[in-house]
Amino acid sequence: MQSIPIKNVGTNRLVDTFQREYYYLRLSVTDVCNFKCTYCLPSGYQPPVQKESFLSLDEIRRIVGAFAAMGTEKVRLTGGEPTLRKDFLAIVETISALEGIKKVALTTNGYRMEKDVERWKKAGVSSINVSVDSLDPRQFYSITGENKFHQVMKGIERAFEIGYEKIKVNSVLMKNLNDQEFDRFKNWVKDKPIQMRFIELMQTGEMDQFFNRYHLSGQILAEKLLKEGWILRQKDRTDGPAKVFSHPDYLGEIGLIMPYEKNFCASCNRLRVSAKGKLHLCLFGEEGVDLRDLLVSDEQQVILQSRLYAALQGKREHHLLAQGNSGIRTNLASIGG
């Protein structure tokens, strides 16, 4: 495990050595997921032999409080499937009440949306990303291992009914599986305020063969969009890495997340904390910096902030995916993608 010294670093902002400032925290609250997606957990969630508890509500409050004190404005709750936690609403309420936090976002597989999305909104979830890898129910089942396509679609409609003005939908782009649905997805968002985001398949330790078989560059879609009159939109400082395209004839938008693109890391603005309390500087990076020993008491906040800053000074300028190095990540379920 990486050892980070505790010292008075003389700063209260999350700024790395390349002058990138980190406004955005992706916080995994569980590794557990009830879907069996082919590109992530094809055999379903397998509990580790040495069971370690996920972050408690108090630990979550302390870690997000430290990030907020150092300039973080947006927190995204990920997993696993974050809504599987029994205290999910309490987590949202706690984070949204912290000083400095302006947005609490959620990434979900959507299986509970129809029933629970109104409660999520009241608790403080300001935006939702839903994973939908196919608009064909049979293909959806083939990719996710769950026959819940119609349930997820109803959940998205319910979110609009109760007041969400925009929903983001994530689809992992896979050659010969769902890339042929691009026009179908595009037509789906023509009259709906949906930002349809296509994410390039990413290489991880357990999925090398899958990656080699199904990876498709998002640049192909970017060129297609530009030819059809779509316009690249400017980013806000808390936005994620997606390149977002809009079109005057479409209510919805198209986003492309292309981690293999040159300069992908230049505008990095997010850090990640795993469900077991490790800080990860990069999705494709190191083993992680353990924070849990500094989440025991509220009196540890200053030391916790010092460790966060010290760790951040070791963040690389960019990942090494182009060299075939995806770090130690065996899959994306434990860190929320």
From Swiss-Prot:
S-adenosyl-L-methionine binds at residues 39, 80, 131, 202. Its EC number is 4.1.99.22. Keywords: 4Fe-4S, GTP-binding, Iron, Iron-sulfur, Lyase, Metal-binding, Molybdenum cofactor biosynthesis, Nucleotide-binding, S-adenosyl-L-methionine. [4Fe-4S] cluster 2 binds at residues 265, 268, 282. Binds 2 [4Fe-4S] clusters. Binds 1 [4Fe-4S] cluster coordinated with 3 cysteines and an exchangeable S-adenosyl-L-methionine and 1 [4Fe-4S] cluster coordinated with 3 cysteines and the GTP-derived substrate. GTP binds at residues 26, 76, 107, 168, 270-272. Transmembrane segments: none annotated. It catalyses: GTP + AH2 + S-adenosyl-L-methionine = (8S)-3',8-cyclo-7,8-dihydroguanosine 5'-triphosphate + 5'-deoxyadenosine + L-methionine + A + H(+). Its cofactor is [4Fe-4S] cluster. InterPro entries: Aldolase_TIM, Elp3/MiaA/NifB-like_rSAM, MoaA, MoaA_twitch, MoCo_biosynth_MoaA/MoaC, rSAM. Monomer and homodimer. HAMAP family: MoaA_B (MF_01225_B). This is GTP 3',8-cyclase. It comes from Mannheimia succiniciproducens (strain KCTC 0769BP / MBEL55E).
